[in-house]
Design a protein with these regions (language model features):
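Flexible, solvent-exposed loop/hinge segments and secondary-structure transition points
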Residues: 31-184
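Bacterial N-terminal signal peptides
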Residues: 11-28
């Protein structure tokens, strides 16, 4: 007896293998037909650079005998690295991330945004509604740029008012020194 798919049992097996291959590989592909895709290019801000920023900010906080959390985001708002100093509260990571995210989307220091928000609270209404619970209009978030190109942001939380940004700037200063040393 002949099957609708061909002349006997082998055609059914071949058809089954082809169907399984199509399901495993996706449409328009077969096993071994396509070379592996290259890895995505690394972010402009490397993990090593993020750690340099964090280490600079942590050194500043230690010098002042303070505890804090610091977060580094890439240009798309994705986490590169974060540190919570021993004894710093667990909720500070979210706060630091919110500050970094806010400085990233505003392309400005969150301390500047906080000052502008005092005189005109409606200024950031749209962005706060677009990102509910993610925008923090308090100091401690600073954008990161290389050759005037935004590459990420740093956010610091847990320090007294005005000191968060100083810690972030200390981290950025350490990063700038690191970048300068790499050029030599």
């Amino acid at each position: 007896m002949k099957h609708a798919l061909g002349h006997g049992r082998m055609s059914i097996i071949a058809f089954s293998i082809a169907m399984i291959s199509a399901l495993l590989c996706g449409p328009g592909m077969s096993l071994g037909a396509e070379a592996p895709r290259p890895l995505a290019p690394p972010t402009a801000l490397s993990l090593r650079e993020a750690r340099v920023i964090i280490d600079g900010a942590v050194a500043y906080a230690r010098e002042k005998k303070l505890r804090m959390t610091v977060v580094i985001l890439d240009e798309e708002g994705q986490l590169i690295s974060a540190d919570r100093m021993e004894g710093a509260s667990f909720h500070l990571e979210r706060f630091a991330k919110g500050k970094a995210f806010t400085s990233l989307i505003l392309r400005d220091r969150t301390e500047t945004a906080a000052e502008l928000n005092k005189t005109r609270p409606d200024r950031y209404f749209g962005i706060m509604n677009m990102y509910p619970g993610e925008v923090y209009l308090v100091g401690g978030g600073v954008p990161l740029a290389i050759d005037n190109r935004l590459v990420g942001a740093v956010g610091v939380a847990g320090l007294p008012e005005g000191v968060d940004e100083k810690a972030a700037l200390a981290g950025i200063d350490a990063w700038n020194k690191y970048r300068d040393s790499m050029k030599k």
